[in-house]
A protein has these predicted regions:
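Generic early N-terminus positional signal peaking at residue ~5-7
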Residues: 5-6, 151
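Histidine-/acidic-rich catalytic cores in large beta-rich domains
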Residues: 21-245
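Bacterial N-terminal signal peptides
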Residues: 6-16
Length: 245
């Protein structure tokens, strides 16, 4: 602990200094061989990092990561295991989707999750095809099924300001908005690509990162495309490839 304390203090002081100057920090999940979660400054200099499990334990990608209000970091160490760690890398919470709440023996992988204001954790279980909410002890508090017909191949998911939940499904390439209380579909948009990310904007439109479509699209509630960038970014030499948000 004598070794760790100066390091932790340095990280905290660094983060505080950046916060005081209103400079942006970036939380990074680097995977597919990198296997690291890190906090960097706007220049890319690493202020803090944590090595993760990596392919040797069946995990090849960090598809979601969050810094929590308490300063801890919530990430997934394998396709099925979520962990919350402190800046001194102590695991303070862990949940294994593969062996919990009826999933044993089933194929399940996780690409999206979030800590809720009530302290529970919402997890989207791809393949199993459901969204669950578990408490700090891993007890199932709420769940609803994803829409049948291919939407169980879920990727990124995010809550809206209305409290509904946007879930992206690579196949059949659709963004679906659910009422989290009963799992009813309240809106969807078929983009016909391996769509990866979507978020609801303040104006009520939905920004969609099309994944394999190499594009970013803004659509209205009436499902009309109001803005789009595809392929090459106008006025630059930047070519869009696999897109997420």
């Amino acid at each position: 602990m004598k070794i760790l304390f100066p390091l932790i203090l340095t990280v905290i002081l660094s983060l505080s200094a950046f916060t005081a100057k209103a400079e942006r920090l970036v939380l990074v999940g680097a995977s597919y061989g990198k296997n690291i979660v890190a906090i960097t400054d706007a220049k890319g200099d690493v202020l803090w990092s944590h090595k993760t499990a990596g392919p040797q334990r069946g995990h090849t990608g960090h598809h979601d990561v969050h810094m929590l209000p308490n300063g801890n970091i919530l990430f997934h160490d394998t396709w099925t295991t979520l962990k919350e760690i402190t800046l001194d890398k102590k695991v303070v919470w862990q949940y294994d989707c593969a062996n919990s709440n009826g999933n044993k023996g089933k194929r399940v992988d996780v690409h999206a999750f979030a800590r809720l204001p009530n302290g529970n954790t919402r997890i989207v279980e791809s393949s199993v095809g459901r969204v669950i909410e578990v408490d700090k002890d891993g007890k199932l508090k709420h769940q609803f099924a994803l829409k049948p017909g291919g939407t169980t191949s879920s990727r990124w998911a995010r809550a809206t300001d209305k409290g509904t939940f946007l879930v992206c499904s690579e196949r059949p390439g659709v963004v679906t908005e659910y009422d989290v209380k009963d799992g009813k579909v309240v809106w969807d948009y078929l983009i016909n690509t391996r769509v990866y990310g979507a978020m609801r904007l303040k104006n009520g439109n939905t920004l969609i990162a099309s994944g394999s479509g190499n594009s970013v699209v803004e659509v209205s509630p009436e499902k009309k495309v109001v803005w789009e960038i595809k392929g090459k970014v106008p006025g630059t030499e930047v070519n869009l490839k696999w897109m997420t948000c």
